[in-house]
A protein has these predicted regions:
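C-terminal charged capping/lid subdomain of soluble metabolic enzymes
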Residues: 46-129
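Active-site segments that bind and position negatively charged phosphate/pyrophosphate groups
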Residues: 1-63, 68-69
């Protein structure tokens, strides 16, 4: 999935940041990386059709497409700080992405990926009804 969907730098950096939040401990490496793939696609401004395709694919595999599916319906300010300290730290792989990486930009990309996931799940439920 990762090689086709986005660079693995952002995906694994997001995973590493998520591991700083104890509430994500029950979730597997691949589940956290899946959400990182979505964040990486948003960071890289992937075409809309590619985003839809990856959301469908991850959902079909029962992988998380929202933060809530990773046990994070909301994050505290401290959780965001811990996550971003790791995901955007000076030695983080995310700096291999082809754009300037900022903590605010990564947070916004994660929030957008989460919002898109919620919208996707809402529209998927409607089409199954």
């Amino acid at each position: 999935v990762g090689f086709e969907a986005t660079n693995l730098a952002a995906a694994h950096s997001i995973h590493n940041g998520l591991t700083r939040i104890p509430r994500t401990a029950p979730y597997l490496h691949g589940e956290k990386v899946a959400f990182g793939i979505l964040t990486g696609l948003v960071l890289n401004r992937a075409p809309e059709e590619e985003l839809r395709r990856v959301y469908r694919f991850l959902n079909a595999l029962q992988l998380p497409v929202t933060l809530e599916q990773l046990g994070l319906p909301e994050l505290t300010g401290q959780e965001w700080e811990d996550l971003l300290d790791t995901a955007c730290g000076p030695h983080s792989l995310i700096h291999n992405e082809p754009m300037e990486i900022t903590r605010q930009g990564v947070r916004e990309a994660m929030e957008e990926a989460d919002a898109r996931g919620k919208a996707f799940l809402g529209s998927s439920a409607e089409t199954r009804s």
